């Protein structure tokens, strides 16, 4: 029979049999928290903050992954932390950050880690107030530190830090930092790490019989630190850095010499300091450069160590120069900011019922803070009701355009450029009536926000002791939009005139990003105990200016015709130039010295020169202006002129801006001199001969700049080709001709043609105009060959999204009905896709053909300010060409094209969430009201946490409403997942509740109404690790209700189960809701559950935890891998239920079955016959999924709940252990 101690050991051996508690997202627990026997893992990217839980005892292993954090803190001044990690056979492994902080408490804190293996490769911070002695121990048989261990107290007391198991070994390859602390050594120390003592800290080597590896370093970081070594041990050598300025090295016995040696000796050649008590001695490698006359025997009176009278040695001089190991460099971060320790406020949206029984949505401002008893409480500060926000999208447009032929066969249409942004960029379109003999005239006017003339940036670089160097070095001129006017006119028997005005398009304001990074380096130099500190400031200044602008050329052409066909052409080409930018050097220096003397030290601070800053950008005709450098003295600046003698001895005059401060003056900027003001400078026109590569000699001319013996060609005039034999008889004129493309389409081109005798040469071909067509609707048809612009309405129906180069229509239509017509036209798209070149048709009212044109995606972007932009995406456009309608009565016809611009007609309602902690998107959409064979797209609205609900963000193409001709039912739905896992003192619920929204777009072919909506949903495990007890029960609650319409509904639920029992129940639900459910079950057969659910007119919200209207039904079964179908049908089969359904799914697992980390649900419309596997996504990402066309994709919803140790499992374990103990006894 086992003894009692053996039984205890056996129980301890079985204790690690527990689940692993995983932290996968940020979590804050305040107040009392119960801990189970379980291993804890904090995943990368997450933290767990435990606030004001005074006693934290963890049983099990701990793993903190990289980029993860664990915080245990106390904000109460009364109760300090008592933290213990106990796992005899467990592992404590930190790769991230761990903080234990009880600095706010006035009582003693205890931090104790007792485990089999301790590994630290991250950072660990232990902090306490130090009002009373604190305990900080890390005990492990396998102890390794490769990171940072920081032990801090606000003041030093007798408490000590203990590392490792007694008489064991610790391996330190990292840094162990002590601040107002005492480390007492009780183990061997191996490794190549470093112990750092700072702020009145002491390193106490209390048992030198346990060796310290020679590669270990000890750094005394300031004048108040010390190290003490036990005298009763074998002689060792300790590497000590930073000895000097009054800090101490001592023994546990007084320093007393013997007959042969004194109490201490220093070897100036090896840097070894030997300290003795008669025949006991210890060696310290302090380095070279010490003056033996500055050593002094003193007493270390520090708390927590044996104070030996005259047992220590100090050095009153400065620390000689010596290279400090990199592992001893002090980490500037002494602690980490702990989340959850400060009062916070958050906004929550909730539903409340008023006295009249109506439900309303409210937004409340909550504050979480501590009361007078230092307990965390939550209180409501402000409550405001919020309305439901409805956003109306523009309706689907059916566009009819008239393609009207002209006498010459060239179609001239009005075009416009349209931009729409959030800042209200205004577009105006004017349609000018055109007479029969005139070409179409168009006017574009794009007006944007006012643009400032100049934009200046100011860089302020603060330095030590109130010294500031201020730079205003960048002036960016922005010209207002320039306008180009051009008029083309020709005089002959007929006169054509058109005038256009085009405003240059500038962005609303220039986008400018400036990044300034400043690094301050400090270097200390100790000479004769006078510490001189130099500060050097490195400034990295970068500026990025992004501007989009266009420049238009001005073309003025006048053509004169007379009776003898002689004419002259005057070509005037004017170009509107964009503003020129040149760089001017800018150098200024500001020196300021501030001396401060004291008894101990002197500091000299000098600000650095900023001559390497980038030069400013200035306009040629804009004077340079700078702000003066601020200083404590009075400064002024003025523009003066002075004489300078150049290298050739000549005297020239320069001017610039001078900064005057007292009797000093500094040149800030020197103005560039004009070339024509330079001495000896001339400019003239000259002609010279040039020999070409073929040996011919040609004459060139140009403008020459000459100054002294130097001359430079500024401009060379273009020469005429002298090799034309008929050059003298050549005339140039504008001509239009027809060109047949490779695909057979016919287009018209025009250009300037040079003609001499029988020769014609095209000099210039005018490019085709690129524009976006605006289609206008006209109710009155026109006769062939006539353009009557007066009948065209000036309001455009829509603007197409394609870029068309040219549209040519040749009129070959006879004027009698019943004949065959040929319509030749070629609208060219960006993808070189053309409509059919020849379309032969007979006039008919019903015949039509559809030709899709896939145009380019046009992304129009306007820059608002740094870091934000507004983009407009235009979808592909489909062009439907109908046969022309011919009316024989007045010989009029219409050629109609149908454009589907893919804009859906729908209302989108944003419903606020009642779960403020959830990041789930809030999405609700209405169906497509068009016919079943209409193709369109809709935009989803996603409201982020940091986004105002009144300004939703539109994203194109995330959801698709589509129906094909083969199917009379189309379907769209979202699943907006909101999970709420309640936490009560650390206990997590394994139940699952999912709120989702079923969106329907159901239309029958006759009445265009939705009379039924069916959904299938499936529950199945995601991985093999999930254990589901077939004998257990799940309670399912699924509710659905018509959105915003209170009418009767009938619900039918079919379910197939593997095993069940006969159940018949009747349930009555309050608030005017009744439910009757009958269940028939047979062993091994299908189970059919029929539920009749009646929602009375005007029924209010259910009392269940949901804001959805309707009746909740429940069913008890064990539905592993079962499919369920829920159908909504109006009782009278006449009510249109095309809108959305609210639904709430609740799954409650009994304690023996719901032991899973992941749960996957799939909601599939009945019309989707093909079911794809759902892809599992963590619910923390709060993704929104949509069904694809024809069931190609299936929405997946995964809800992840933390695994918790259920009550029954530890009970069973302890019952099993008790039985084992009884057997052993």
From Swiss-Prot:
Glycosylated sites: 97, 200, 488, 595, 634, 694, 933, 1035, 1133, 1150, 1182, 1193
Residue span of region Disordered: 832-852, 1049-1114
InterPro entries the UniProt entry points to: Cell_wall_rpt, Hyphal-reg_cell_wall_N
Pfam families in alphabetical order: Hyphal_reg_CWP, Hyr1
Any single Gene Ontology cellular-component annotation: cell surface
Subcellular location, record wording: Secreted, Cell wall; Membrane
Expression induction or repression: Constitutive expression independent of white/opaque switching or mating type locus.
Keyword Phosphoprotein among UniProt keywords: no
Similarity comment text for this entry: Belongs to the HYR1/IFF family.
Record protein name field: Hyphally regulated cell wall protein 4
């Amino acid at each position: 029979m086992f003894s009692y101690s053996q039984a205890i050991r056996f129980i301890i051996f079985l204790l690690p049999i527990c689940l692993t508690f995983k932290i996968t997202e940020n979590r804050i627990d305040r107040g009392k928290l119960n801990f189970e026997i379980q291993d804890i893992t904090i995943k990368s990217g997450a933290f767990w903050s435990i606030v004001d839980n005074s006693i934290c005892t963890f049983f099990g292993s701990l793993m903190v992954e990289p980029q993860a954090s664990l915080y245990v803190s106390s904000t109460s001044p009364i109760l300090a932390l008592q933290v213990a990690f106990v796992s005899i056979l467990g592992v404590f492994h930190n790769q991230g950050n761990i903080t234990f902080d009880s600095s706010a408490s006035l009582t003693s804190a205890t931090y104790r880690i007792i485990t089999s293996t301790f590994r630290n490769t991250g950072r660990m911070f232990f902090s306490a107030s130090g009002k009373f002695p604190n305990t900080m121990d890390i005990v492990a048989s396998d102890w390794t530190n490769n990171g940072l261990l920081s032990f801090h107290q606000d003041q030093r007391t007798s408490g000590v830090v203990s590392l490792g198991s007694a008489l064991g070994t610790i391996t330190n390859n990292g840094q162990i930092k002590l601040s107002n602390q005492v480390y007492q050594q009780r183990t061997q120390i191996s490794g190549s790490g470093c112990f750092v003592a700072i702020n009145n800290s002491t390193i106490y080597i209390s048992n030198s019989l346990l060796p310290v590896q020679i590669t270990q370093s000890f750094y005394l970081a300031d004048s108040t630190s010390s190290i003490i070594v036990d005298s009763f041990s074998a002689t060792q050598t300790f590497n000590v850095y930073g000895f000097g300025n009054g800090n101490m090295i001592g023994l546990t016995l007084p320093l007393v010499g013997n007959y042969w040696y004194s109490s201490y000796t220093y070897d100036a050649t090896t840097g070894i300091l030997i300290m003795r008590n008669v025949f006991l001695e210890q060696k310290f490698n302090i380095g070279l450069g010490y003056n033996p006359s500055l050593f002094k025997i003193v007493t270390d009176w520090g708390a927590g160590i044996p104070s030996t009278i005259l047992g220590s040695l100090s050095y009153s001089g400065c620390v000689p120069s010596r290279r400090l190991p990199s592992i001893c460099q002090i980490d500037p971060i002494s602690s980490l900011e702990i989340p959850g320790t400060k009062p916070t406020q958050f906004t929550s949206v909730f539903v409340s019922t008023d006295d009249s029984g109506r439900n309303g949505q409210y937004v409340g401002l909550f504050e979480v803070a501590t009361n007078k008893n230092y307990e965390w409480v939550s209180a409501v500060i402000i409550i405001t009701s919020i309305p439901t926000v409805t956003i109306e999208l523009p309706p689907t447009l059916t566009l009819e355009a008239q393609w009207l032929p002209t006498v010459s066969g060239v179609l001239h249409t009005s075009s416009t450029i349209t931009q729409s942004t959030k800042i209200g960029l205004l577009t105006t379109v004017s349609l000018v009536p055109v007479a029969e003999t005139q070409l179409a005239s168009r006017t574009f006017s794009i007006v944007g926000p006012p643009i400032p003339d100049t934009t200046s940036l100011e860089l302020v670089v603060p330095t030590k002791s109130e010294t500031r160097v201020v730079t205003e070095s960048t002036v960016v001129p922005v010209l207002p939009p320039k306008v180009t006017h051009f008029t083309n006119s020709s005089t002959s028997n007929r006169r054509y005139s058109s005038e256009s005005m085009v405003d240059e398009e500038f962005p609303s304001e220039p986008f400018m990003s400036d990044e300034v990074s400043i690094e301050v380096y400090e270097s200390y130099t100790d000479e004769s105990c006078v510490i001189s500190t130099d500060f050097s400031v490195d400034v990295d200044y970068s500026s990025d200016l992004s501007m989009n602008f266009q420049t238009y050329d001005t073309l003025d052409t006048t053509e004169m015709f007379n009776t003898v066909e002689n004419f002259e052409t005057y070509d005037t080409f004017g170009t509107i130039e964009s503003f020129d930018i040149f760089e001017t050097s800018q150098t200024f220096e500001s020196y300021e010295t501030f001396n401060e003397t004291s008894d101990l030290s002197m500091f000299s601070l000098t600000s650095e020169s900023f001559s390497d800053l980038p030069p400013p950008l200035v306009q040629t005709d804009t004077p340079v202006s700078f702000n003066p450098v601020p200083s404590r003295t009075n400064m002024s600046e003025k523009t003066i002129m002075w004489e300078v003698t150049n290298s050739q001895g000549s005297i020239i005059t320069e001017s610039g801006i001078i900064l005057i401060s007292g009797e000093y003056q500094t040149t800030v900027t020197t103005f560039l001199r004009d070339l024509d003001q330079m001495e000896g400078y001339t400019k003239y026109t000259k002609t010279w001969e040039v020999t070409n590569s073929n040996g011919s000699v040609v004459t060139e001319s140009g403008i020459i700049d000459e100054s002294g013996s130097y001359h430079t060609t500024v401009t060379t005039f273009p020469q005429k080709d002298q090799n034309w034999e008929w050059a003298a008889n050549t005339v140039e004129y504008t001509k239009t001709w027809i060109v047949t493309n490779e695909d057979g389409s016919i287009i018209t081109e025009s250009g300037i043609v040079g003609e001499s005798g029988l020769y014609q040469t095209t000099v210039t071909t005018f490019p085709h105009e690129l524009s976006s067509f605006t289609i206008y609707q006209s109710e009155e048809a026109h006769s062939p060959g006539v353009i009557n612009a007066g009948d065209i309405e000036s309001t455009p129906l829509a603007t197409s999204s394609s870029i068309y180069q040219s549209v040519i229509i040749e009129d070959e239509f006879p004027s009698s009905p019943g004949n065959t017509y040929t319509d030749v036209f070629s609208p060219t798209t960006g993808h070189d896709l053309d409509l059919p070149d020849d379309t032969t048709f007979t006039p008919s009212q019903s015949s039509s053909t559809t030709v899709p044109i896939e145009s380019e995606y046009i992304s129009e972007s306007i820059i608002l300010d740094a870091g934000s932009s507004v983009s407009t995406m235009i979808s592909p456009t489909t062009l439907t060409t109908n046969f022309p309608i011919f009316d024989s009565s007045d010989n009029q016809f219409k050629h109609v094209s149908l454009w589907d611009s893919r804009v859906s007609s729908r209302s989108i309602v944003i419903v606020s969430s009642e779960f403020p902690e959830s990041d789930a998107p809030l999405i609700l959409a209405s169906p497509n009201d068009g016919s079943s064979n209409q193709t369109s797209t809709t935009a989803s609205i996603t409201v982020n946490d940091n986004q105002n609900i009144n300004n939703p963000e539109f994203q194109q193409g995330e959801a698709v409403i589509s129906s094909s001709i083969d199917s009379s039912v189309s379907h769209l739905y979202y699943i907006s997942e909101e999970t709420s896992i309640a936490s009560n003192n650390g206990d997590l619920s394994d139940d699952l509740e999912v709120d989702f929204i079923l969106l329907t777009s159901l239309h029958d072919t006759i009445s265009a109404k939705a009379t039924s909506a069916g959904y299938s949903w499936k529950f199945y495990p995601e991985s093999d690790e999930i254990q589901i007890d077939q004998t257990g029960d799940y309670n399912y609650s699924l509710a659905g209700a018509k959105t915003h319409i209170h009418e009767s509904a009938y619900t039918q639920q079919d379910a197939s189960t593997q095993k069940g029992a006969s159940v018949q129940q009747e349930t009555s639900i309050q608030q005017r809701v009744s439910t009757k459910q009958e269940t028939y079950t047979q062993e091994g057969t299908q189970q059919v559950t029929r539920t009749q659910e009646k929602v009375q007119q005007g029924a209010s919200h259910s009392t269940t935890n949901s804001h959805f209207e309707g009746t909740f039904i429940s069913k008890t079964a064990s539905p592993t891998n079962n499919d369920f179908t829920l159908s909504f049908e109006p009782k009278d089969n006449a009510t249109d239920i095309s809108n959305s359904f609210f639904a709430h799914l609740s799954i409650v697992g009994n304690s023996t079955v719901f032991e899973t980390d992941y749960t996957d649900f799939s909601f599939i419309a009945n019309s989707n016959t093909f079911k794809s596997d759902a892809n599992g996504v963590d619910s923390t990402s709060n993704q929104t999924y949509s069904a694809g066309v024809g069931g190609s994709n299936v929405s997946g919803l995964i809800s992840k709940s933390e695994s918790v140790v259920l009550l029954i499992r530890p009970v069973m374990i302890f019952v099993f252990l008790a039985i084992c103990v009884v057997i052993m006894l």
